[in-house]
From Swiss-Prot:
SMART domains assigned to the protein according to its UniProt record, in alphabetical order: ZnF_C2H2
UniProt zinc finger (C2H2-type) residues: 16-38, 76-98
Compartmental location: Nucleus
Transmembrane region(s): none
Disulfide bonds: none
Any single Pfam family the record assigns to this protein: zf-H2C2_5
GO CC terms: nucleus
GO MF term (any one): DNA binding
Role: Probable transcriptional activator. Binds to the consensus sequence 5'-AGGCCY-3'.
Family: Belongs to the krueppel C2H2-type zinc-finger protein family. ZFX/ZFY subfamily.
Free-text comment on this protein's domains from its UniProt entry: The binding of ZFY to DNA is mediated by the interaction of the GGCC core base pairs with zinc fingers 12 and 13.
Entry protein name: Zinc finger Y-chromosomal protein
UniProtKB keywords: Activator, DNA-binding, Metal-binding, Nucleus, Repeat, Transcription, Transcription regulation, Zinc, Zinc-finger
Length: 148
């Protein structure tokens, strides 16, 4: 697996360890920047999920997490497979699996997608020289998340 070998190679190059969380870094500057995360966490009141380990400094993000992960309210039901969704827009997007509809067309080639985010990823990875995906360990950049 390319990703696993990449991670192992990158971890071998890391010699400095954060004494608060155990994360490893290749140079002191990266460790210093990382330690700011721990300082910011201590300065802010953390909102913790009562069902799992999730925590955040923002109440709104906790509310979104609770709805997305722990809510059992799925009022919009797919008539084809019975899967439930919280919002009508999620059901509409899901229905494209059953209908085969792909309304999003690439402006550079024949690629079509049922989802706008998949089209954006396609354009970035196939039609640009951008390298938007960065490895957290070695900081190299890649055009596709599968390469990280």
């Amino acid at each position: 697996n390319h990703m696993e070998s990449h991670k192992l190679t990158s971890k071998a190059e890391k010699a400095i360890e954060c004494d608060e969380c155990g994360k490893h870094f290749s140079h002191a500057g990266a460790l210093f920047t990382h330690k700011m995360v721990h300082k910011e966490k201590g300065a802010n009141k953390m909102h913790k999920c009562k069902f799992c380990e999730y925590e955040t400094a923002e109440q709104g993000l906790l509310n979104r997490h609770l709805l997305a992960v722990h809510s059992k309210n799925f009022p919009h039901i797919c008539v084809e497979c019975g899967k439930g969704f919280r919002h009508p827009s999620e059901l509409k997007k899901h229905m494209r699996i059953h209908t085969g509809e792909k309304p999003y067309q690439c402006q550079y080639c024949e690629y079509r997608s049922a989802d706008s985010s998949n089209l954006k990823t396609h354009v970035k990875t196939k039609h640009s020289k951008e390298m938007p995906f960065k490895c957290d360990i070695c900081l190299l950049t890649f055009s596709d998340t599968k390469e990280v």
